[in-house]
Amino acid sequence: MRQGSIVHKTLEDQVHTMVEVEVLTKEDAWGLRIWNIIQGLKTLRDTGMTREMEVWGVVDGLVVNGVLDELSYICPDRELEKATAKSNKDTPSADQTSITNFLDQDSGVIKNLRDIIEKTSRIYLTDVKTRGAKSIPKGASFRPTLMQLMLYHRLLSDLATNKVDSIIIFNRYDLDPAAPFSDSFIAQIGNLNEVFVDASTDPKQDPDIPSPAQDSMQILLEHNSLQSLWSLMILEFKRTMPAGVKSIGNVLKAEYRGQVDGAILGIKTFLYDNKVMQTYLDDEMRWWKGEREAQGVCMEEAYKCGFCEFADECSWRKDRIEEATVAHRARTRSVV
């Protein structure tokens, strides 16, 4: 776990500069989390990539959160996307320009990032997993990662389309959305002197979106509460993903890296499937709300029972043992 965290931290440091900020209140702490998302979206627009961006959502009345390991404008599997384009009108057209077409072949330097963003317009999710083993998971072992990435896609889509009720989030964590941030917090963020500059967006398009001349101090003073800062965050989502859900690519990527050296072990790509995701969520929520019994793992993953802390009291496991015993006795009697 610790080695995996080091790998994630190394990747994050490639994109972001970490600055320590002291918080005095719960609202300050959450304000910092929202501020980091705003900065993450700005980084995505400016550089074409951001990492370790937190997202929140509400699933069947329950608050769910996660951290997106990577967002970028680079499609992880162009062939998969092209294949689905033939049967799905909402996928990119065949003449859509690839980000690689804007790379200088000799130096690999992006020539015109703004042109890339305008032409590709889609953002793709990547989840990074670290492993001690040199192999990557297959079959049932891959399912948790598949569902996790699809859930992150859903959470990001809901934020991009302003479907998340912030009051539910704030109530869940006992936060006062109208409470002003502490002077210390505003001063620290203001001293970072982060200027909101985005040449591709005309500030006249929306008076609520920060103009290029606004710095961190001015922005926080104008959005001096969680509710106000949340509204600014939603505007930044709108700015980054103007087409809403269609701004988010359906090709998802799971990247596996070694725990020790961070070397890439393998990559899996797949498509977001809303029906599969909804079926999974409905079933999980039924268990979470006590509307169904817990279900055990499939035979392929029965090895997990060996280190499960609930193994000794697991009724599902005991039932499977009883079923196997009865079946064995029946076979023995039939042979005799």
Protein language model features and the residues they cover:
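Flexible, active-site-adjacent loop/turn segments at secondary-structure boundaries
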Residues: L149, Q295, Y303
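Nuclease catalytic cores
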Residues: M1-W56, G61, N65-G66, D282-W288, ...
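Surface-exposed helix-capping loop/turn segments at secondary-structure junctions
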Residues: M18-V23, T161-I168, K289-M299
